[in-house]
A protein has these predicted regions:
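Flexible, solvent-exposed loop/hinge segments and secondary-structure transition points
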Residues: 19-139, 143-156
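Bacterial N-terminal signal peptides that target proteins for export
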Residues: 1-9
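Bacterial N-terminal signal peptides
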Residues: 8-18
């Protein structure tokens, strides 16, 4: 019995020290959709669990896209709201799982994406500021938003 404890104690200690991931959900999908398109009366799913068309009284307001990228080690869930022509209307962080680097949820950092299109550089160090201490998170969110801006052309 003592040898069993001696063998498993280091593993148990390592798990305890590592601790659980730091996951914080800031917004649900429904909350993010409503923030992106407050006047929308209906969200129609265009692509299962990923893309919705927002409309009000039959008028298309834009598209809401949910995506997920890796931060440094763990996923970041975010959304991009697009105008009908593909211009970025809003970006939100829905869930951040890393223990640090959550500055990517800062409204001032996310506001940099507003008005950008597929023709914009959308590159950290160019038209998007890097975040010290969240370099990989800011890089990967920016790459994800750029991918969605390119995808927006297929939504018209």
């Amino acid at each position: 019995m003592t040898s069993w404890i001696r063998l498993t104690a280091p593993a148990a200690l390592a798990i305890t020290i590592a601790g659980p991931a730091h996951a914080v959900q800031y917004l649900s999908l429904a909350q993010a959709q409503k923030l992106a398109f407050p006047s929308a009366t209906h969200f129609t799913e265009v692509q299962a669990g990923r893309v919705w068309k927002a409309d009000a009284g039959g008028r298309v307001l834009g598209f809401f896209v949910f995506d997920r990228v890796i931060g440094k080690h763990l996923y970041i869930d975010y959304s991009v709201a697009l105008e009908p022509g593909g211009r970025i209307h809003r970006v939100d962080i829905l869930q951040y799982r890393e223990s640090y680097g959550d500055d990517v949820k800062s409204p001032s950092w996310l506001a940099q994406f507003v008005g950008k299109t597929v023709a914009s550089p959308l590159k950290v160090g160019n038209d998007i500021r890097n975040i010290s201490g969240a370099t990989l998170s800011s890089l990967h969110v920016t790459e994800g938003v750029k991918r969605i801006a390119a995808f927006a052309a297929s939504l018209r």
